[in-house]
Amino acid sequence: MLTSPQPRADGRLADVMRPLQITWDPMGFALSSLIIRTGRTSVLCSVCVEEGVPRWRKGQGKGWLSAEYRLLPGSTPQRQNRELLKLSGRTQEIQRLIGRSLRAVIDMAALGETTLRIDCDVIQADAGTRTASITGAWIALKRGCDRLLEQGLLTHQPVIEQVAAVSVGLVESYPLLDLDYSEDSRADVDLNVVMGSNGHLLELQGTAEGAPFSRNQLNDLLNLAEPGLQHLQAFQRSALMQED
């Protein structure tokens, strides 16, 4: 693996994550909520619970989880218009990714016929908003389910595994972990990696923005992502312990 000889603009080495921070429960009426900060990217993640499930799910004794994702108007240098009647393709893609990633680690039977709704609202975008959304939403989801257990509304913990996500990319041929916007905008390859706590991959989203990339370069990026994901999952566990 090529290693960049120069520190990055923010002083990090190639394999170092941006600083992580959690602010708990900024929304008093949600089942659970938090703001996750990774560098200058900030995402508000909240969980709400609803009785019942979608029509196609009724009568199966299983729950459901859905996710929504939005960029708030002031989250980028140029104001983002609110998506009201029609969602952009990017927004639809990201919220489906968040939903798939979280449903993969939920025992729907343990929810009964209950729906959990995840909302991820980007307060400030400096790249990595979808990966921060997944990582933060899992923390909020786990705490929300803990609260349902404490209230006697669930009998079993439905969250069966952790899930976290991180971006890696090739910038001037060098693999970098957890790209910020200045790096993401110059990347020849951008890869989002979603991983469970058992080390299994849940999803890969990779794009050659410039030249095609080789299998060896893909392996280099995955090898860079894995310890970053393990770091994120350790952070998730620590955040839950601190909140308790």
UniProtKB/Swiss-Prot annotation:
Keywords: Nucleotidyltransferase, RNA-binding, rRNA processing, Transferase, tRNA processing, tRNA-binding. The keyword Nucleotidyltransferase applies. Phosphate binds at R90, G128, T129, R130. The keyword Manganese does not apply. One of its GO terms (molecular function) is tRNA nucleotidyltransferase activity. Its EC number is 2.7.7.56. GO terms for biological process: rRNA catabolic process; rRNA processing; tRNA processing. It holds the Pfam family RNase_PH. It catalyses: tRNA(n+1) + phosphate = tRNA(n) + a ribonucleoside 5'-diphosphate. InterPro entries: ExoRNase_PH_dom1 (IPR001247), ExoRNase_PH_dom2 (IPR015847), ExoRNase_PH_dom2_sf (IPR036345), PNPase/RNase_PH_dom_sf (IPR027408), Ribosomal_Su5_D2-typ_SF (IPR020568), RNase_PH (IPR050080), RNase_PH_bac-type (IPR002381), RNase_PH_CS (IPR018336). Homohexameric ring arranged as a trimer of dimers. Belongs to the RNase PH family. Phosphorolytic 3'-5' exoribonuclease that plays an important role in tRNA 3'-end maturation. Removes nucleotide residues following the 3'-CCA terminus of tRNAs; can also add nucleotides to the ends of RNA molecules by using nucleoside diphosphates as substrates, but this may not be physiologically important. Probably plays a role in initiation of 16S rRNA degradation (leading to ribosome degradation) during starvation. This is Ribonuclease PH. It comes from Prochlorococcus marinus (strain MIT 9313).
